[in-house]
């Protein structure tokens, strides 16, 4: 099996810096009474801050990495001429953002021929971030980030954006087994897993830009990321991040 090469440290540093700046731009609008919000056809809120942050990131990425593609939530994809693409979600957790809840995040990832090479989760309202580069480890403000070693469902903190879309009575089974279930979801839930504060994060329905950073962040932190069918992909429409020991057991319960 071919081992993918480490990503360039400078590329990771630029990604972290750009996403922090994009996060600062969203903070200017956070909890403002005059926050401008549009709605998509499905009712999902799109604050003006979302569009502003995506536009900023696209402009900066085009300047620093010409030819790289971009996949974002709010604008059409930019094709790649380099074999690389950036995947971004300027505000992950728009409902939290528009309600003044500080658990929203900014997400940025770089994908190359070997898979996701760079991943950043920025939590601007909390003053936290988690980032990783392939072969460079996973990091937070507190230093190296590692998943927990909790190996039993009993006592495991399991996050989810929603338990309503879990199959059957899975949530009830886990609750009866002693798991601690919390809906601290979106990028925040993944950050909790990567830093050892939660054992798992379950996302029943996602788009690629919702989970772009997660494969490299979880891998470099010592955990695992797959979709709910068990594939190591951000294209599967779902996501499961764990500390590793609980992954197969949760997959068996959650597999569609």
PLM segments and residue spans:
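Residue-level signal for inorganic ion chemistry
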Residues: 22, 26-29, 50, 61, ...
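Generic detector of well-ordered alpha-helical packing
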Residues: 51, 74, 90-93, 124, ...
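DPxDG-like acidic metal-binding loop motif
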Residues: 80-136
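A structural micro-motif at secondary-structure boundaries
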Residues: 140-144
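An extended, acidic
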Residues: 147-256
